[in-house]
Amino acid sequence: MPSQPPADFTDFKVADLSLAAFGRKEITLAEHEMPGLMSIREEYAAAQPLAGARITGSLHMTVQTAVLIETLVALGADVRWVSCNIYSTQDHAAAAIAAAGIPVFAWKGETLEEYWWCTEQALTWPGHTGPNMILDDGGDATLLVHKGVEYRKTGILPEAENEELAVVRALLDRSGLDWTAMSSEIRGVTEETTTGVHRLYEMHRDGTLLFPAINVNDAVTKSKFDNKYGCRHSLIDGINRATDVLIGGKTAVVCGYGDVGKGCAESLRGQGARVIITEIDPICALQAAMDGYQVATLDEVVDKADIFVTTTGNKDIIMASDMAKMKHQAIVGNIGHFDNEIDMAGLAQIPGIVKDEVKPQVHTWKFPDGKVLIVLSEGRLLNLGNATGHPSFVMSNSFADQTLAQIELFTKPDEYPTDVYVLPKHLDEKVARLHLDALGVKLTTLRPEQASYIGVEVDGPYKPDHYRY
């Protein structure tokens, strides 16, 4: 693959093109660890099921995502890509994608203005009104299209409730994109993460969803693998790279015990930490207790713990008033999608507090009494801001789900009226099968009479949609 883009190709913006050769080496290594994606590439390349697809991708621009992008292209798609987080881009991966002649607009450490400019570029298709497919992580590309349509319809800009919405408001006010025409051509969106899925269900409930969506997050091969096993790996990686603090013997609080929280708690306990869970859901709280964790409220333990990790996908989980009660040198980080789980704005407004950068995405906050907190990635995803995210094998599951979901929506538009769907079970099982050989797994095969007895086909699917794995 080239280390420089074609001479006439300028439709990109990355930090440093000279990193492309390094990025290509890491992409090649990742391909070996991503058997699901590579198998799909081999199976579908001749048929070109995504020929004619114009995919706007908004998902962390990492080495693993580069393998996803090149898989989509290999299946016939045209792609324009941005990262879905200002800190998550791996600049060498972005450079390698640009060098391959694929439009990409992403670099680590974007401002909010730059971030939303990049998203606008990914939705801008020369010669077309826009994309006809969206691949989203967190829902920002989908949100921008919906806000644009609303603005064109009503002439009313969204309220600037926070700094980010103020940036979106300014973008919509100046943008020349025809959001209404764009939305009419979009066949659907496939959404990667819990937070984006919440947005989709809210829009559908309110009657404002403009096109069909597949909830990739709740595919079993995504939520039970990426969310749990991926976070189990990458949380510790992020904390270690950021702080080099020994985790063994420390007390850690994990806010939330969903799939992400379960993976985080397991990894911290595996390092020897005493882990305490906070939960709102009685079922998840009972699970945590049965798994051997103390379950308490944040108020009960906020002045006793050494490490705090938010995993909920909700807002205002750790407030400035909570941080004021924490121990000296407590570490505070988030692994939920957005930056509103930790009250960073409130922390900055404490009179006399002083923020100091230790290194990129690691800051100390010194209170007037001399107490210092260590905050990772400014409250954004610490596993991507302070480390490199989930390992390739886990992401192969999620990105195989994404690829099959894109094919499903693009090739079968009549089967998906506007609604929010989950990935069909047979595709979920297909993704799992594609990863078994790499782990040396040998499946038992049902005999016909056994399959008949439990009411399934010999080749599956084996579980009903409501089954909880």
UniProtKB/Swiss-Prot annotation:
Substrate binds at T62, D137, E192, K222, D226. It is an enzyme of class 3 (hydrolase). It comes from the Bacteria. One of its GO terms (molecular function) is adenosylhomocysteinase activity. Gene3D superfamilies: Adenosylhomocysteinase-like, NAD(P)-binding Rossmann-like Domain. Its EC number is 3.13.2.1. This is Adenosylhomocysteinase. The gene is ahcY.
